[in-house]
Curated annotation (Swiss-Prot):
Cofactor: Ca(2+)
Claim: Hydrolase is one of the keywords in the record: yes
EC top class named in words: hydrolase
Organism: Bungarus fasciatus (Banded krait)
Residues engaged in binding Ca(2+): 53, 55, 57, 74
Name under which the protein is recorded: Basic phospholipase A2 Vb-2
EC number of this enzyme: 3.1.1.4
């Protein structure tokens, strides 16, 4: 075999080994983002660091109605995990959007339908809740005990 071909093959193998250590990204977050846009007018990034429960993790008492939407969504995902093999952050699902109406179309009782229903309820809740800019990017250690 040509030495140049061996070098290319080696480079491909090394890059594949490196890629094997990259954790998979949550797949349904793109769907959830699109669902949020379907239900309301705020960009999804407005919710990433909002209050005590919006974004990763969550603790303490929700600061307002919007933060309660995120807490409820977290609890809904916790319930979805009881399906055994249901991992909400990685479970994709089918739905339709006819602004502002969202319809989940996976089979009732399935993991996908349950996760879709969680995301749908949260998106509708987000759209209905007032947004308090003072609750964005707060110090969670100070305000969320």
């Amino acid at each position: 075999m040509n030495p140049a071909h061996l070098l290319v093959l080696l480079a491909v193998c090394v890059s594949l080994l490196g890629a094997a250590n990259i954790p998979p990204q949550p797949l349904n977050l793109l769907q959830f983002k699109n669902m949020i846009q379907c239900a309301g007018s705020r960009l999804w990034v407005a919710y990433v660091k909002y209050g005590c429960y919006c974004g990763p993790g969550g603790t303490g008492t929700p600061l307002d109605q919007l933060d309660r939407c995120c807490q409820t969504h977290d609890h809904c995902y916790d319930n979805a995990k009881k399906f055994g093999n249901c991992i909400p952050y990685f479970k994709t699902y089918e739905y339709t959007c006819n602004k502002p109406d969202i319809t989940c179309t996976d089979a009732k009782g399935s993991c996908g339908r349950t996760v879709c229903d969680c995301d749908r309820a949260a998106a509708i809740c987000f759209a209905a809740a007032p947004y308090n800019l003072a609750n964005f990017g707060i110090d969670k250690e100070k305000h969320c005990q």
